[in-house]
Amino acid sequence: MSSSSIHSLTGAPPVASAALAAHGKRITSIDALRGLVMCIMMMDHVRETLYLHHQVGDPMDISHTPPFLFFTRLAAHFCAPIFVFLTGLGAWLYANPPGAPPRSAREFLLKRGALLIFLEIFVMSFLWVGQWPEKVWLQVLWVIGFSMIVLAFASGLPRKVLLVAGLLIVGTHNLFTSIALPPDHPMHALWTLFMHRDVLFDTVPQVRVTYPAWPWVGVIFLGWCAGPIFARGFDSARRRKLLVLMGAGCWLALLVLRGFNIYGENTPWTHWPTTVQTVMDFLNYTKYPPSLDFLLMAVGGGCFVLAAIDQADNAFTRFMSTFGGAPMFYYLLHLAVLITGYKLLLAVFGPNQVSSSGVERFGVGPDQFWIVWVVTVLMWFVLYYPTKWFGGFKRRTTIGWVKYF
């Protein structure tokens, strides 16, 4: 287990190496889950590289989204909520090292949160398109960074207060997400940052918010509150039982709320001509911002996986832990490889697809969508050894800034 395996996207710091090592396989399960969702995330990014000419909506349009595309996109829905949940969990582990008094996580959260926002604005937008973009998108790194900054100031509150706050935020934000304020409204900028996906600054470059922050703050609070069950000395059987109960509670609430179209998703599901389409509609949730149903599905699934791999040590957990142990390096590297590969393919073969907006791109057609899955698996193995090397280098080095990656 590396000293920084939980720091970059999740919030455990490099200085906590002794603390994290003492948690042993429990922390390995966290790394493995993070690595798993990052591998799934790559599949979605490969899709966006090779199949961007076929845009998917939010929520998706069932009548124009074939099942292979729907379920590929649906799998990626688990990634961001689990990232943010593990961010809070990792921050709690830092603040409560085993065998030592509790310590403040404020400075750690502030520094890493600010770094993630910086990377989102000045690095990620470039990596997505391979040039300085006309639009800057505030996406997952921005919202993780912002949530970390909020948690930095809230982490001194009693855990019960954060638990209630997290539940209230996650449970009630759906009441307000359909409200859109016009650009000339004095509260438009704040509303866009926190609640509604929109243009933040209509400048050059234009700044757009993809991930409104408010519901994600609730998720990071809940992750922090889950931290104690991963403390050293916590009975592993009891931890697995609690994780299963948490996952079952999330999915049971989802089945009731979604099944009866009570609350939690602004778009109700209906019966379609085929069973597959009906299932797709039932699972068709809003991501930007995440609906309550979206979060229940993803966080509940994450709890089940954590329970299943708790204290596991096998080829699967070791493979996934490699990616989860150096998450920022892996994240930046996979985007750099994808955009470089795309530019080469475009230069060699030229554009062969046209989007609905008339933009010509290189890509694969519906009959070749399997290439997206094959490229994803190949990318896992291409990036495995560089990520493993960097994880080892990060553990050995005394260079301070390397620990942030």
For the regions a protein language model found, what residue spans apply to each?
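Alpha-helical transmembrane segments and their immediate juxtamembrane cytosolic regions
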Residues: 2-405
